[in-house]
Protein backbone atom coordinates (compact mmCIF):
# COMPACT_ATOMS: atom_id res chain seq x y z
CA UNK A 1 0.00 0.00 0.00
CA UNK A 2 2.84 2.54 0.63
CA UNK A 3 3.83 2.09 -3.03
CA UNK A 4 0.28 2.88 -4.13
CA UNK A 5 0.17 5.95 -1.90
CA UNK A 6 3.48 7.17 -3.31
CA UNK A 7 2.18 6.63 -6.84
CA UNK A 8 -1.04 8.55 -6.21
CA UNK A 9 0.85 11.46 -4.64
CA UNK A 10 3.24 11.67 -7.59
CA UNK A 11 0.40 11.41 -10.10
CA UNK A 12 -1.54 14.16 -8.35
CA UNK A 13 1.58 16.35 -8.31
CA UNK A 14 2.10 15.87 -12.05
CA UNK A 15 -1.55 16.57 -12.81
CA UNK A 16 -1.42 19.77 -10.76
CA UNK A 17 1.51 20.94 -12.89
CA UNK A 18 -0.56 20.42 -16.04
CA UNK A 19 -3.51 22.21 -14.45
CA UNK A 20 -1.29 25.16 -13.55
CA UNK A 21 -0.26 25.42 -17.20
CA UNK A 22 -3.91 25.29 -18.29
CA UNK A 23 -4.74 27.97 -15.72
CA UNK A 24 -2.08 30.28 -17.13
CA UNK A 25 -3.26 29.65 -20.68
CA UNK A 26 -6.88 30.41 -19.76
CA UNK A 27 -5.79 33.65 -18.10
CA UNK A 28 -4.02 34.62 -21.31
CA UNK A 29 -7.11 33.80 -23.40
CA UNK A 30 -9.23 36.06 -21.21
CA UNK A 31 -6.86 38.93 -21.90
CA UNK A 32 -6.74 38.50 -25.68
CA UNK A 33 -10.37 37.51 -26.31
CA UNK A 34 -12.35 40.32 -27.92
CA UNK A 35 -15.77 38.73 -27.53
CA UNK A 36 -17.32 39.26 -24.08
CA UNK A 37 -19.26 36.01 -24.27
CA UNK A 38 -16.07 34.13 -25.06
CA UNK A 39 -14.32 35.74 -22.10
CA UNK A 40 -17.14 34.65 -19.81
CA UNK A 41 -16.90 31.07 -21.05
CA UNK A 42 -13.13 31.03 -20.54
CA UNK A 43 -13.62 32.36 -17.01
CA UNK A 44 -16.08 29.55 -16.35
CA UNK A 45 -13.59 27.03 -17.71
CA UNK A 46 -10.90 28.55 -15.52
CA UNK A 47 -13.10 28.02 -12.48
CA UNK A 48 -13.55 24.35 -13.38
CA UNK A 49 -9.80 23.93 -13.74
CA UNK A 50 -9.26 25.57 -10.37
CA UNK A 51 -11.74 23.19 -8.73
CA UNK A 52 -9.89 20.17 -10.10
CA UNK A 53 -6.70 21.63 -8.66
CA UNK A 54 -8.34 22.00 -5.25
CA UNK A 55 -9.49 18.38 -5.34
CA UNK A 56 -5.99 17.18 -6.18
CA UNK A 57 -4.52 19.32 -3.42
CA UNK A 58 -6.94 17.80 -0.92
CA UNK A 59 -6.04 14.33 -2.15
CA UNK A 60 -2.31 14.81 -1.71
CA UNK A 61 -2.83 16.48 1.67
CA UNK A 62 -4.82 13.47 2.86
CA UNK A 63 -1.93 11.19 1.90
CA UNK A 64 0.84 13.36 3.35
CA UNK A 65 2.23 12.88 6.87
CA UNK A 66 0.54 15.31 9.28
CA UNK A 67 2.62 18.28 10.40
CA UNK A 68 1.50 19.33 13.85
CA UNK A 69 1.45 22.75 15.43
CA UNK A 70 0.63 21.75 18.98
CA UNK A 71 -0.71 23.92 21.76
CA UNK A 72 -2.15 23.38 25.25
CA UNK A 73 -5.84 22.55 24.99
CA UNK A 74 -8.39 21.54 27.58
CA UNK A 75 -10.14 18.27 26.77
CA UNK A 76 -13.44 19.84 27.73
CA UNK A 77 -12.86 22.65 25.20
CA UNK A 78 -12.01 20.07 22.54
CA UNK A 79 -15.34 18.33 23.12
CA UNK A 80 -17.25 21.61 23.06
CA UNK A 81 -15.54 22.70 19.84
CA UNK A 82 -16.27 19.31 18.30
CA UNK A 83 -19.97 19.61 19.14
CA UNK A 84 -20.10 23.10 17.65
CA UNK A 85 -18.35 21.95 14.48
CA UNK A 86 -20.77 19.06 14.09
CA UNK A 87 -23.78 21.30 14.71
CA UNK A 88 -22.63 23.63 11.95
CA UNK A 89 -21.83 20.88 9.43
CA UNK A 90 -24.54 18.34 10.28
CA UNK A 91 -27.30 20.17 12.18
CA UNK A 92 -29.98 17.48 11.87
CA UNK A 93 -27.80 14.43 12.46
CA UNK A 94 -25.71 15.90 15.29
CA UNK A 95 -28.79 16.87 17.26
CA UNK A 96 -29.45 13.18 17.92
CA UNK A 97 -25.94 12.37 19.20
CA UNK A 98 -25.74 11.52 22.90
CA UNK A 99 -22.72 13.01 24.66
CA UNK A 100 -21.02 11.92 27.88
CA UNK A 101 -18.05 14.13 28.68
CA UNK A 102 -16.30 13.00 31.85
CA UNK A 103 -12.89 14.40 30.93
CA UNK A 104 -13.10 16.87 33.85
CA UNK A 105 -10.01 19.10 33.93
CA UNK A 106 -7.87 16.96 31.64
CA UNK A 107 -5.35 18.92 29.60
CA UNK A 108 -3.98 17.97 26.20
CA UNK A 109 -1.23 19.16 23.89
CA UNK A 110 -2.71 19.00 20.38
CA UNK A 111 -3.08 20.63 17.00
CA UNK A 112 -6.80 21.48 17.00
CA UNK A 113 -6.72 22.50 13.33
CA UNK A 114 -5.94 18.89 12.47
CA UNK A 115 -7.54 16.93 15.30
CA UNK A 116 -10.99 18.50 15.11
CA UNK A 117 -11.51 17.63 11.41
CA UNK A 118 -10.12 14.15 12.13
CA UNK A 119 -12.73 13.56 14.83
CA UNK A 120 -15.44 15.10 12.67
CA UNK A 121 -14.64 12.55 9.96
CA UNK A 122 -15.65 9.75 12.33
CA UNK A 123 -19.07 11.30 12.81
CA UNK A 124 -19.46 11.97 9.08
CA UNK A 125 -18.88 8.28 8.41
CA UNK A 126 -21.31 7.31 11.16
CA UNK A 127 -24.00 9.57 9.72
CA UNK A 128 -23.81 8.30 6.15
CA UNK A 129 -22.53 4.69 6.13
CA UNK A 130 -24.83 1.83 7.08
CA UNK A 131 -26.35 3.40 10.15
CA UNK A 132 -28.98 1.31 11.95
CA UNK A 133 -31.75 2.43 14.28
CA UNK A 134 -30.58 3.83 17.59
CA UNK A 135 -28.54 6.73 18.91
CA UNK A 136 -24.92 7.50 18.17
CA UNK A 137 -23.08 8.02 21.45
CA UNK A 138 -19.83 9.88 22.08
CA UNK A 139 -17.97 9.66 25.38
CA UNK A 140 -14.79 11.19 26.74
CA UNK A 141 -12.85 10.50 29.93
CA UNK A 142 -9.34 10.59 31.36
CA UNK A 143 -7.82 7.31 32.47
CA UNK A 144 -4.28 6.26 33.43
CA UNK A 145 -2.68 9.39 32.03
CA UNK A 146 -4.60 9.17 28.77
CA UNK A 147 -7.56 10.95 27.26
CA UNK A 148 -10.02 8.36 25.97
CA UNK A 149 -12.65 9.16 23.35
CA UNK A 150 -15.14 6.55 22.17
CA UNK A 151 -17.76 6.74 19.45
CA UNK A 152 -20.46 4.07 19.30
CA UNK A 153 -22.64 3.85 16.22
CA UNK A 154 -25.46 1.34 15.69
CA UNK A 155 -24.84 -1.06 12.81
CA UNK A 156 -26.66 -4.27 12.00
CA UNK A 157 -25.02 -7.28 10.39
CA UNK A 158 -21.63 -5.60 10.32
CA UNK A 159 -19.20 -8.06 8.73
CA UNK A 160 -16.11 -6.00 7.92
CA UNK A 161 -12.88 -6.72 9.72
CA UNK A 162 -11.70 -3.93 12.01
CA UNK A 163 -8.17 -5.31 12.35
CA UNK A 164 -6.70 -2.81 9.89
CA UNK A 165 -9.21 -0.02 10.54
CA UNK A 166 -7.82 3.15 9.02
CA UNK A 167 -4.84 1.38 7.50
CA UNK A 168 -6.34 0.76 4.07
CA UNK A 169 -6.49 4.02 2.08
CA UNK A 170 -8.29 3.95 -1.27
CA UNK A 171 -10.27 0.91 -0.07
CA UNK A 172 -13.83 2.17 -0.66
CA UNK A 173 -13.75 4.99 -3.23
CA UNK A 174 -16.87 6.69 -4.54
CA UNK A 175 -17.76 9.83 -6.44
CA UNK A 176 -15.92 12.68 -4.74
CA UNK A 177 -14.62 10.35 -2.02
CA UNK A 178 -11.48 8.24 -2.17
CA UNK A 179 -11.52 6.15 0.98
CA UNK A 180 -8.99 8.37 2.73
CA UNK A 181 -10.95 9.74 5.68
CA UNK A 182 -10.20 7.04 8.26
CA UNK A 183 -6.63 6.76 7.01
CA UNK A 184 -6.10 10.48 7.57
CA UNK A 185 -7.81 10.40 10.97
CA UNK A 186 -5.62 7.55 12.13
CA UNK A 187 -2.47 9.27 10.88
CA UNK A 188 -3.35 12.46 12.76
CA UNK A 189 -4.14 10.59 15.98
CA UNK A 190 -0.89 8.64 15.81
CA UNK A 191 1.09 11.81 15.04
CA UNK A 192 -0.18 13.07 18.41
CA UNK A 193 1.24 9.99 20.11
CA UNK A 194 -2.23 8.49 20.28
CA UNK A 195 -3.82 5.16 19.46
CA UNK A 196 -6.71 4.42 17.12
CA UNK A 197 -8.78 1.24 17.17
CA UNK A 198 -12.23 -0.04 16.28
CA UNK A 199 -14.25 -3.11 17.20
CA UNK A 200 -17.74 -4.43 16.62
CA UNK A 201 -19.85 -5.25 19.66
CA UNK A 202 -22.23 -7.99 18.52
CA UNK A 203 -24.30 -7.82 21.71
CA UNK A 204 -25.24 -4.17 21.21
CA UNK A 205 -24.88 -4.17 17.43
CA UNK A 206 -22.50 -1.20 17.61
CA UNK A 207 -19.29 -0.26 15.87
CA UNK A 208 -17.10 1.24 18.59
CA UNK A 209 -14.19 3.49 17.64
CA UNK A 210 -11.73 4.29 20.41
CA UNK A 211 -9.09 7.02 20.35
CA UNK A 212 -6.61 7.59 23.15
CA UNK A 213 -4.27 10.55 23.46
CA UNK A 214 -1.59 11.29 26.05
CA UNK A 215 -2.49 13.91 28.61
CA UNK A 216 -0.28 16.97 28.71
CA UNK A 217 2.55 17.04 31.21
CA UNK A 218 1.69 19.06 34.33
CA UNK A 219 4.00 21.92 33.28
CA UNK A 220 2.79 21.97 29.61
Q: Each predicted region: which residue ranges?
A:
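Short beta-strand/loop element within the Bergerat-fold HATPase_c
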Residues: 133-145
